[in-house]
């Protein structure tokens, strides 16, 4: 009997198209050999072309989900994605504190890949002041980092200043993702006063639905397995590159990645 499987919890929204949110997180965690659990913050009606509806769960039900997970299968790492309201953020912060959760990775999801807004304005301050200080790592893209830092980011030097400002304000490590609107796939990790660049080539693939969810859940999976943060980020970036390079082509808009591109099994056969 296998007793030593590592575990991770995704606290995020559900994506009906399966490319982002908890669906992407569960695929990613499973691909890393980690047992995935979820606490759903919202149901979304979305596909590769956009978000058409969001149905938020109640704070009480989110609280019940978190209690159910933490009192039974305690997660080795926690990834937090889409949380659209201040009330839900407060529930998460309280439960993570009460249960002394470890290896918390926050992906401050504010806008979907399609451009649809995913968080209420009043929730941003709650995210900043109640959730980010609990994080081991926060993984903003450039627009999100501009909101969190209050700075305009137009070059790598701006990225370093913004990452430093976020880290010093909220006392967490920051992985600032440069691929959003800079012409490269270089990401910056700022931790304990030190900047580390992760250089990457931009893969010519328009199907990038769920890349942020996937990267943060890959990092959380690696932390759950005992990796140091820098190694966890490096490994997660390699995984993302592989998933993008697999060139899955589904949907009419920005399609999903192949999260299981490296899964080799006699039970899996290629579709003709």
Task: Describe these PLM feature segments.
Residues 23, 146-147, 205-229:
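Short, small-residue alpha-helix embedded
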Residues 11-17, 196-209:
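Short pre-catalytic strand/loop immediately N-terminal to key active-site residues, enriched for Gly-Thr
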